[in-house]
């Protein structure tokens, strides 16, 4: 199977998952603890990039998304989502309370306010998701660059 991880990185992660210390892994692999540390750190960085890439892909293919700006009260977000859903003819299978509960658990908020900009979106499987990547609206791109066929 194709992977972003090297065989050594996979082996290090497997051994760490079994509870081994970096020094123990180094002994097993015949390398230094510092090298094991580097392998593990780079593997985890690759995994984080892969997760972010998948989230971005899901966001691009989402049914609906709304931007939430830093300082915005999250109690206003469900109404924004429902309004945009109505405009696009999309059914949101969540209540206001469920959306707020989701935001409290998953979004960068503090005391009802967004700590930074983020996007709330409904993916193709009707799951709510939060992304800190703000994508330009393609309709807006078309307006700024002379038309819809200019991408």
From Swiss-Prot:
GO-annotated molecular function: DNA binding; DNA-binding transcription factor activity
Alphabetical list of InterPro entries matching this protein: RNA_pol_sigma70_r4, Tfx_C, Tfx_DNA-bd_arc, Tfx_DNA-bd_euryarc, Tfx_DNA-bd_sf_arc, Tscrpt_reg_LuxR_C
Keyword Coiled coil annotated: no
Keywords: DNA-binding, Transcription, Transcription regulation
Single biological process term from Gene Ontology: DNA-templated transcription initiation
DNA-binding listed as a keyword: yes
Family the entry assigns: Belongs to the Tfx family.
Protein function: Putative transcriptional regulator.
Protein's name in the database: Putative transcriptional regulatory protein TK2151
């Amino acid at each position: 199977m194709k992977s972003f991880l090297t065989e050594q990185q996979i082996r290090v992660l497997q051994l760490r998952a079994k509870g081994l210390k970096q020094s123990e892994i180094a002994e097993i692999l015949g390398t230094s603890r510092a090298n094991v540390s580097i392998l593990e750190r780079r593997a985890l960085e690759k995994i984080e990039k892969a997760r972010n890439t998948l989230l971005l892909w899901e966001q691009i293919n989402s049914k609906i998304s709304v931007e939430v700006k830093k300082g915005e009260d999250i109690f206003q977000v469900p109404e924004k989502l429902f309004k945009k859903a109505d405009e696009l003819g999309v059914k949101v299978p969540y209540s206001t309370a469920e959306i707020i509960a989701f935001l409290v658990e998953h979004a960068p908020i503090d005391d009802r306010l967004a700590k930074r900009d983020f996007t709330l979106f409904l993916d193709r499987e009707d799951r709510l998701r939060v992304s800190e990547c703000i994508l330009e609206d393609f309709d807006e791109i078309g307006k700024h660059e002379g038309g819809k066929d200019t991408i």
